[in-house]
Amino acid sequence: ACGLGAFNVAIFHLITHGYFKALLFLSSGSVIHGVHDEQDMDKMGNLFSKMKITSIVMWIGTLAIVGFPFMSGYYSKDLILNASFNLYELGSLVYILLAIISAMTAFYSFRLIFKVFHGKYNGSFDYEKIHESNYVMLVPLFILSFGSIFAGYFFNEILSGNYSFDFWRGVIFLSQDEHHYSSIYTVL
């Protein structure tokens, strides 16, 4: 988004992305803890029956990162795609590339969810020893889940909406004497 000149959208996405990416990383840590340090997804499967809470919060993080409607990623990704589409000559190309990248993110994210939590257990380790994490690991997951669901809604208007101009005025501006950005279009 910074490369598109949409700095307010970039900061907004940085905040929303921080919630759901942290949620996905900590959820992965909860899975690794629950399966006793195994990290190979091919040796996992059907963990939903043993780790329901971790599965649900990982679903929340996945839905947010793929931009599912009304999750935090939906708001920020939509603004990035909109900013790319509104570029001059390159708008359509950049928009298509970002849409392809978003589709690839959705593919690998859902692949992880279905393989680890809903796939067939392959019997590589003792299934009975798999356990849900305790509250010390789950409480941060709940907090990040809340942010992954609602941060986009709460921060949208402040950081990228009608009131964002007042918020960003004086922080980010383009001087009338600077015209370096026009040479970028010539190179591209």
Residue spans of the language-model regions?
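Glycine-rich, histidine-containing beta strand-loop boundary motifs that form or position
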Residues: 11-15, 23-26, 60, 67, ...
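Alpha-helical transmembrane segments of polytopic integral membrane proteins
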Residues: 25-28, 37, 77-78, 106-110, ...
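Membrane-interface segments at transmembrane helix junctions and kinks
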Residues: 1-10, 14-15, 43-56, 75-101, ...
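Transmembrane-helix bundle segments that line or gate the permeation/cavity pathway
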Residues: 34, 57, 62-72, 99-122, ...
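Hydrophobic transmembrane alpha-helical segments of multi-pass transport and channel proteins
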Residues: 18-22, 104, 149
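Alpha-helical multi-pass transmembrane bundles of energy-transducing inner-membrane proteins
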Residues: 1-41
